[in-house]
Amino acid sequence: MNTNPVFIVDDDTDDQDFVRECWKELGYTNPLLFFKSGEELINELMTHKTVPFLILCDVNIPRMGGFGLKAKLLEEESLKHKSVPFIFWSTQASNEQIKKAYDLSAHGFFIKGNTMKELKESLSEIMNYWQKSKQPQS
């Protein structure tokens, strides 16, 4: 089982706290690393050798936004082939946003939910899927 950290790009500190609580209740052992902007995530990926298990990204993040971040990651040759699932994870989504996410080669688009129960279900579905999915080793 992949024990690499899960990177979460979300500037909402309340959501970060809720995720930490749900993560603990679900019993996952992967470390969580939070980033408040796309620039913070890119800096981490470019300067450190840690390869995340997956990246969960809110659509509405400061400056470049989630879609801008995904587009930037596609431009970076050093990041393009790391086989890291990039999943949009937001409180709501229009059909246009979902289409845009997949146009940018996102690996999924999930709704966080409005309650702790829904948030836990969403995290559980994402983690269960990606723990079972086979990925090339980079």
Please tell me what each predicted stretch does.
Residues 114-124:
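C-terminal output helix
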Residues 37, 65-71:
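Acidic catalytic/metal-coordinating carboxylates
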Residues 53, 57-62, 90:
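Active-site residues of response regulator receiver
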Residues 4-14, 19-23, 55, 87:
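Conserved acidic segment of CheY-like receiver
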Residues 123-124, 128-138:
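CheY-like receiver
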Residues 20, 34-54, 120:
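Acidic, metal-coordinating helix/loop segments flanking the phosphotransfer/catalytic sites
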Residues 68, 93-108, 114:
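Alpha4 helix (beta4-alpha4-beta5 surface) of REC/receiver domains from two-component response regulators
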Residues 80-93:
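A short, hydrophobic beta-strand element within the central beta-sheet of small alpha/beta folds
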